[in-house]
Regions:
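Alpha-helical cap/lid subdomain in secreted, periplasmic
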Residues: 1-101
C-alpha cells in the first residue's frame, strides 16, 4: 500500500494522468485491510484511479476462462488473447471515460 500511495502522490504532484490495477485482487482480505497498521494506508488510496475490475486474473477467469489463458495449471497469467480483450473491453473505455486519452 505504501508503494501505491507513493506512486499516486508522485503522479499527482507531477500532474500526470494515470490509472492503476492489480494482476490479482490484493484488497479482498478484510482481516488484513482492517488491521490497524494497514487500515489507515488503505483508506488513503485513491481507488477511483483503479480499473473497475478485481484484477486482470479475475476478469479473464470470469470472461474468458478458456481462451484467456494458455494453461491455468502452469501459469495464471492471461495470454495474449486475454490481454487484448481486457485492453479492448476495460482499459480503453476506462481511459476514454476518465479523459486520460
Amino acid at each position: 500500500l505504501e508503494h501505491i500511495l507513493r506512486t499516486q502522490w508522485y503522479l499527482e504532484f507531477c500532474n500526470i494522468k494515470y490509472f492503476m490495477s492489480t494482476f490479482m485482487n490484493i484488497f479482498s482480505d478484510e482481516k488484513i485491510m482492517n488491521h490497524p497498521e494497514v487500515k489507515y494506508l488503505y483508506e488513503m488510496v485513491d481507488f477511483s484511479k483503479f480499473l473497475p475490475i478485481e484484477g486482470f486474473y479475475e476478469w479473464n477467469r470470469k470472461n474468458y476462462p478458456v481462451d484467456g489463458f494458455n494453461d491455468l495449471k502452469l501459469d495464471w497469467h492471461p495470454n495474449e488473447f486475454g490481454n487484448v480483450k481486457l485492453t479492448e473491453e476495460i482499459i480503453i473505455p476506462h481511459l476514454i471515460k476518465n479523459n486520460i486519452i
